[in-house]
Each structure stands twice: as C-alpha cells, then as structure tokens.
C-alpha cells in the first residue's frame, strides 16, 4: 500500500492511476493469499511454516496457486501487482511541479528496496512451504487438495490477477 500512497502523493495522472490499480490489485492478490493460507491451515491444522514443506507434492493445486499468487504479490511483470508499483514509481520520478523532487526520488529508491525485500521473503516462504520433501508427519495423513468449491472461489481471483490491465489505457497518461 506504500506504492498507493506514493502514487497519490505525486499528484500526477499516472500516480493516481497507479494508486487505483494498486488498490484493486492489492485487494485481489491479498484476498487470494488469505484464501490459500486459510485452506492450508485447515488442511494441516497448523500455521507453522517450519512443519510444512513439500506442499507441491502433497497439495499440487494449492501449491501451484500459492506460487502464482506469491509471484503476483511480489510484482512479477505482467501480473496485477506489477502495474500499480511500476506506475507509482514512474509518477514519483516526475511529481507535480512544486513538489520536492529529492523526496520523491528517495521514496522511489526506498520503494525499490522494499520490492526486493518483499521478493526475498515471499521466495523464502515458497521455498519452505512448497518445495522440498514433505515432513514425515504428513505422509500418512489423508490431506485434501483444493476441491471444486475452493477452486470456484479462487479462479475468478486468479483471472483478475492475470489480467494485464493494459486495457485501462494507462499508457496515455505517461506523457
């Protein structure tokens, strides 16, 4: 949400568009992350990442969706999370006349560092939860992967996350 605030603070058309896109993307992606974490907590009866692992082998549908959603959350180009962040940085590069450009350029650097840190902790989470070998405590349990009811709630959010948002004609505000 820091990128939303950065976009609004730039007082530029691209910054305001970035804020709107960022809010929608944040709602969709974070909603999907909460759905997935709730489903995994229900399945495993724990939220301890240290006890999880090998989710792609035990729950391949849930694991694949978790990987996709984490990539969208970290701002992978082409997914919903990217456009709001990228456009907010563009808006901050050249804020409205009269605003302190040094503050905005410093905020751009801070935002870029935050993006790298976000990528780091999301990739660390994916490595601990999705990859590796499943713990012995889960091998003899009857774990259920995503069923049709869960998928029917998640697929619309996946589609909204995968929409490129280029139809918003945001490129016309870049000039």
Predicted regions and their residues:
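Acidic-residue sensor for enzyme active/binding pockets
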Residues: 85, 150, 172
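Single conserved hydrophobic/aromatic residue that forms the stacking wall/gate
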Residues: 167-170, 174
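Final/C-terminal transmembrane alpha-helix of multipass membrane proteins
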Residues: 153-164
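Functional transmembrane alpha-helices
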Residues: 1-143
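Residue-level signal for threonine
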Residues: 12, 147, 173
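Interfacial loop-to-transmembrane junctions
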Residues: 138-154
């Amino acid at each position: 949400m820091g990128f939303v605030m950065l976009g609004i603070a730039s007082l530029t058309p691209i910054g305001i568009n970035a804020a709107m896109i960022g809010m929608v993307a944040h709602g969709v992606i974070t909603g999907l992350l909460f759905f997935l974490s709730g489903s995994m907590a229900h399945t495993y009866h724990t939220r301890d990442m240290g006890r999880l692992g090998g989710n792609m082998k035990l729950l391949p549908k849930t694991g694949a969706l978790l990987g996709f959603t984490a990539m969208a959350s970290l701002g992978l180009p082409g997914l919903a999370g990217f456009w709001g962040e990228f456009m907010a940085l563009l808006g901050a590069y050249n804020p409205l006349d009269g605003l302190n450009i040094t503050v905005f350029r410093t905020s751009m650097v801070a935002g870029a560092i935050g993006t790298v840190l976000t990528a780091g902790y999301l990739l660390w989470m994916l490595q601990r939860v999705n990859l590796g070998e499943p713990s012995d405590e889960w091998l003899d349990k009857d774990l259920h992967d995503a069923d049709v009811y869960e998928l029917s709630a998640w697929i619309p959010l996946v589609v909204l996350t995968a929409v490129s948002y280029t139809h918003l004609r945001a490129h016309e505000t870049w000039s």
